[in-house]
């Protein structure tokens, strides 16, 4: 039994939370009440979250047949039909129990030659909204008819997948270096890429680039490809346009063999409104998986909201959390849309005071659910990671549950890409404020682990721009060949490298990159839609650009590899906060260190300063080990990479004596030096 009257550690550690102590205690009590009830009923939350082993199709060896079960409490009548009964809607009636669960049994002797692996089926549901042909919520395979475009559930009962030998442990990989990817648009061809193609062609690229985790978007089935996977229709079915469930499992297994953790982009913030494909009004009511009326609608996303306070909905979602870890061996989740989940206003307010995090605008049921989800993930797979996409800064998001927190391992550093966009859009280079930059990069509590990123898929979507395109725009079409000369391209490439190095070295304890951005992939993402003639031209990745030895893209890609290698070798992310040594606003130069590494960033567009004197953390010999200005990365090589800089004692402005070195501090350059004793 989890109950306590002690002061929660989250409050003990942060006096700013003292006025909210009563509400934090209530939150913790809501969680403990729920987890205690779960443990009394099922023994543990791991054993509780087994909906996928009861609902849907389940083999009964004792009775020699198959059960089909679905929770439809508001339905008046339910039938199952498919190719196994010539699509006769009202032939096979399901039976209802006292809890609103409808079931039908299919004896092997009767259906052996009719109900086979791959058979198609649907439910015929009579509810308050009339008679509807529907796809079950627990369907594990859903396919689209190419002619009619209709989706249908598929009876999926292959031979068990062979996971033998897959004992991958993500915790042994060190700090997370995440490669964010979308399977469908990962290929160069115009069309939808497959799990198999991703396994064979893209995983080796990710491994070679030095990343140790791949974060997969759009895994759960979604009817509209252009939704980027965020309007989910079937929560237990992998997107069939990319292949079979077994091919997705093979992708995960191969990633593990390469030493790559696989993180799933999990969408539990909302679900698609569609009746034909999704779970909306599945039992005929508007309050099946959501609250009734406006309370169950997300107006900003035109989608439906889950009722996180309903036991059956919590069970459905928690079962879904366990399902992907258990059946597909995913190594954790990025929980999408957490801000929308935890506030009734979905975060569309100014978080200008403490009360915003504790008033009636907070969805307490969602907070309880997320806490339970984190408990489940870490109880079932202790090495798994959970990442929260929360822009509000909700206190306790990454604090352990036992301390009064919500239990996420990481939060996304969403203020970082916003800062870079604002800077590039609104501020001339010579007016960049290096103190503001430093504050944004390091603005996090010590115990809150942050995933730093300069850009993700959000910045690549149509209507926005990638960093590369924001920096170089149409010049990329004409001057990315190595023989061409362009001050726009020179500036863009220099800043592209500096921004990424600044982000990874100061922004957090993990790092994320969206596929292709490491080599400056041009243009944004535009999925096929009526407005572009259903074209796939901008829903793909042009890997050939980075492989073409006559183009500059390979220089950016080579820099990214070198940057990742250095950060991993010297455990920069494990060091958490950088040690700020100097901030020279006049020359736009900042100096900081991580262990024996010294980082010097000169953001000035023109000022290159010979014999520039700067403080270092410890005496010794400093040698450059990485520079954005190296010729191998498309730079001008204005510094000698074999130079040695010996420290000498000197006094700072406050008359404190400390070791210094002198360097050639070149404009728009970031250089990393290694201290040798």
What is the predicted role of each segment?
Residues 1-175, 179, 196-207, 488-497, ...:
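Carbohydrate-interacting/catalytic domains
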Residues 72-74, 84, 98, 108-110, ...:
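Short, flexible loop/turn elements at secondary-structure junctions
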Residues 95, 224-229, 273-281, 398-400, ...:
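Short glycine-biased active-site loop of nucleotidyltransferases that positions the nucleotide triphosphate
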Residues 143, 160-176, 182-362, 646-649, ...:
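Substrate-binding/active-site clefts of carbohydrate-active enzymes
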Residues 147, 329-331, 350-539, 568-614, ...:
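Conserved alpha/beta catalytic core and glycan-binding cleft of carbohydrate-active enzymes
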Residues 203, 207, 252, 321-325, ...:
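Non-transmembrane alpha-helical segments in soluble domains
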Residues 222-224, 244, 270-274, 334, ...:
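Flexible loop/turn segments at secondary-structure boundaries
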